[in-house]
């Protein structure tokens, strides 16, 4: 239907809004998330990094951000691209995808081979990591809780006796990060992994 008054149609208005928290109306926007993580501590069995997750609108303006820490296994760049190496992943730029998209892709391939579908355990995955698969973002406090995965935390500590890093309040920070992804990751989520 032509809109001679140069105003949005009822359909455009209806689809441009969604229910917000507590019944208020908020406008839908096409936002994306970029997570910049910098490794700052290398222990015998764990690596800690600081991160900032930033949400951007479609014009590139930052609309929100959160900070925290990630725990990964020990860093060994010689093994970072080796399957099942139980080390932190190689530095680089990766996509973060919800499990539903990864499950769909994996199960499509499995069905082609006549295999049964699988159900992934975690909510968010780091995608297309060279030589690696199943790199998730999930809760945990210790290096033994991760096999290449990213464990978010509110803060961290270093144990001099065992020469390992740990993160704390992981469930709280994971919920905050996952809510951030859900709220702002409509146009994609990227993670940039670097070191100081």
Regions found by a protein language model. Give the residues of each.
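Cell wall/extracellular polymer interaction/catalysis modules
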Residues: 2-166, 172-187, 194-196
């Amino acid at each position: 239907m032509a809109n001679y008054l140069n105003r949005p149609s009822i359909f455009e208005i209806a689809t441009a809004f969604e229910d917000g928290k507590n019944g208020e109306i908020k406008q839908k926007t096409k936002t994306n998330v970029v997570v910049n993580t910098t490794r700052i501590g290398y222990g015998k069995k764990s690596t800690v990094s600081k991160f900032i997750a930033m949400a951007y609108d479609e014009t590139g303006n930052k609309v929100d951000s959160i900070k925290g820490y990630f725990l990964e296994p020990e860093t060994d760049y010689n093994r970072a691209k080796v399957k099942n190496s139980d080390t932190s992943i190689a530095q680089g730029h990766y996509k973060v995808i919800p499990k539903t998209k990864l499950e769909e892709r994996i199960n499509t391939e499995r069905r082609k081979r006549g295999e049964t579908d699988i159900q992934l355990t975690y909510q968010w995955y780091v995608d297309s990591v060279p030589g690696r698969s199943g790199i998730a973002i999930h809760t945990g406090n210790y290096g033994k809780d991760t096999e290449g995965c990213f464990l978010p935390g509110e803060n961290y500590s270093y144990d001099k006796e065992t020469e390992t890093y740990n993160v704390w309040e992981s469930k709280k920070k994971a919920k905050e990060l996952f809510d951030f992804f859900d709220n702002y990751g409509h146009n994609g989520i990227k993670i940039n992994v670097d070191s100081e």
